[in-house]
Amino acid sequence: MRWANILLVAGLCRASLGQYNEEEDLAWLQYYMRQSRMSSYNYMPYYEDENSPYVYSYVPAPDTEAEPVPEAQQASSWQCPQECDCPPNFSSAMYCDTRNLRYLPFVPTRMKYVYFQNNQITAIQEGAFDNATELEWLALHNNQISSEKMGKRVFAKLKNLERLYMNNNNLTKMPSPLPRSLRELHLSYNQISKVPSNALEGLENLTALYLSHNYIFEMGASLKGLKSLILADLSYNHLRKVPDGLPMALEQLYLEYNYINAIPDDYFKVSPKLLYVRMSHNSLTNQGLSTNTFNSSSILELDLSYNRLQKIPRVSTNLENLYLQGNQINEFSISSFCTVVDVMNYSRLQVLRLDGNEIKRNAMPPDAPLCLRRATVIEI
């Protein structure tokens, strides 16, 4: 107020000397009043009581009257919960990670990227995200969230959600329903035992599915309708059979560390873009494979190490890396790589690992150098 009085006197003095100009001389007063309004706002904590995390709005006491707040200040009053950080230069992001939170703070409407990872959150109540329907990126990994304490339709209204991170929690069931907009789903390191056929229904935009390190023993046909899926990581589970049907767009399939002992005929033919197949540490035998199971022209890398194979399975001449170490292979069959061996017909194989088998170094046939002329590493 002191500076206001000085400025006011200065302005009046100037006017009395006949130097008054309405446009110029009222500008300083308008500026001061604007500054006064802006600086008078008191930044109160979002929550009145930290023990009531789901009381989303502040209600004044009955015997008091809420002081009117300018519109611009009302917008900023819900800008960020006190438990989190909302960078001014990234106004659509809210960082609440690594703060020992036991509950989900309120998510303001405009938020698109929200990070709750590395906390002790155990539950997600129904409607927790109903106010934040613009969310695109939701990080909930490394918490203690259980399926029993999660709302049945907690993600259903998030029509713009593209990435959901829930790995490293205590989930025993697949969260469902999930929004069709989803592109990445991270559910590794949970306790999920089954993926129902309709669990991923309608997720036509899903490109990456991470379900490793669970207790899944059955996948059914849950992958079949995922027409955009590029990567499926189902490693470190309890699968005894491969999923029923693969998506056409699939490029990477990880099934290592399961109990799979057989693969149906032409299983990989339905995925013409498949590049990487990893099935190490399973129970595969030659009896459980057809002659051309892995003879797919698109596959570039095939890992069948640490299984129960006794013979080298037939592979495509386009294959570049083949890992067969730790099996029971006792013969080197060149027909597994080249059906015809001559100058024009040869394998593109660059890396071949056969160490840890029953095969001997002198078992390599004389025409092997011609067939495997591209190989830079052959370990026996």
From Swiss-Prot:
Repeat region (LRR), residues: 110-131, 134-147, 160-180, 181-202, 205-227, 228-248, 249-270, 273-293, 298-317, 318-339, 348-371
Keyword terms, alphabetized: Disulfide bond, Extracellular matrix, Glycoprotein, Leucine-rich repeat, Proteoglycan, Repeat, Secreted, Signal
Name of the encoding gene: FMOD
One Gene Ontology CC term in the entry: extracellular space
Residue intervals passing through the bilayer: none
InterPro entries: Leu-rich_rpt, Leu-rich_rpt_typical-subtyp, LRR_dom_sf, LRRNT, SLRP
Organism: Gallus gallus (Chicken)
Subunit annotation: Binds to type I and type II collagen.
Protein name: Fibromodulin
